[in-house]
């Protein structure tokens, strides 16, 4: 498995924000969200995407990844855990592109055997076969379903069958939407469409890869939540550490 980074921090987003957490970020994604417009220069070219570009553009960053097997991944988690009791956040990229990978499966099962609480951060577009892989029912899924502002085509980013499966089978699941203050009317329509087809808890977050851009959106997103009865989630890690990686 290609590991982009691993670190102990706090969960900065969604229903469980503020929780002590070990983050295990795996390489690879099925989306490239150009609409988020985060830019990084690499190998004499400009890469455009979300705030986890290093995990998405695997060809450009592969030399910085670690290749670890399931046992080595577990050892990393135990080392980061120290004597604490953190949750383990499996993130990316899109970690569920690996959900049928034998090495990945072994790692997740090892974590569960060692009594870790596992949270997946996913875009919700990949349907898990919960009958074939029932251990995923013991996990929590934070579903960052992409809206029009991501730049991804609708038929690719919305998989209602997958979203219903997370709600019906997982230990817990919820939506976390990244919203731009300039496109709230469209976002409202999209969110309602998703809720109609696949109801779940909602947490709305302001778009912004750094503290300055986050601040531009935050108040309007909070007011949008109050107006429409949604939960607001700030992005604590950006508030505290701006755009620093590995925190």
From Swiss-Prot:
Annotated residues for binding of Mg(2+): 52
Catalysis: reaction(s): 6-carboxy-5,6,7,8-tetrahydropterin + H(+) = 7-carboxy-7-deazaguanine + NH4(+)
Pathway: Purine metabolism; 7-cyano-7-deazaguanine biosynthesis
Ligand binding (S-adenosyl-L-methionine): 93, 144-146
Phosphoprotein as UniProt keyword: no
Matches recorded under CDD domains: Radical_SAM (cd01335)
One Gene Ontology term from the biological process aspect of the record: queuosine biosynthetic process
Keywords (A to Z) from UniProt: 4Fe-4S, Iron, Iron-sulfur, Lyase, Magnesium, Metal-binding, Queuosine biosynthesis, S-adenosyl-L-methionine
GO molecular function: 4 iron, 4 sulfur cluster binding; carbon-nitrogen lyase activity; magnesium ion binding; S-adenosyl-L-methionine binding
Record-listed [4Fe-4S] cluster binding positions: 29, 33, 50
Cofactor: binding details: Binds 1 [4Fe-4S] cluster. The cluster is coordinated with 3 cysteines and an exchangeable S-adenosyl-L-methionine. Binds 1 S-adenosyl-L-methionine per subunit.
Residues the record lists as binding substrate: 10-12, 25, 91
Enzyme Commission code(s) on record: 4.3.99.3
Residue intervals of the Radical SAM core domain: 16-243
Cofactor: [4Fe-4S] cluster; S-adenosyl-L-methionine; Mg(2+)
Keyword Lipid biosynthesis: no
Lineage: superkingdom: Bacteria
HAMAP family: QueE (MF_00917)
Function comment: Catalyzes the complex heterocyclic radical-mediated conversion of 6-carboxy-5,6,7,8-tetrahydropterin (CPH4) to 7-carboxy-7-deazaguanine (CDG), a step common to the biosynthetic pathways of all 7-deazapurine-containing compounds.
Oligomer status and interactors: Homodimer.
Family: Belongs to the radical SAM superfamily. 7-carboxy-7-deazaguanine synthase family.
PANTHER family: 7-CARBOXY-7-DEAZAGUANINE SYNTHASE (PTHR42836:SF1)
Name the UniProt record assigns to this protein: 7-carboxy-7-deazaguanine synthase
Taxonomic source organism: Campylobacter jejuni subsp. jejuni serotype O:2 (strain ATCC 700819 / NCTC 11168)
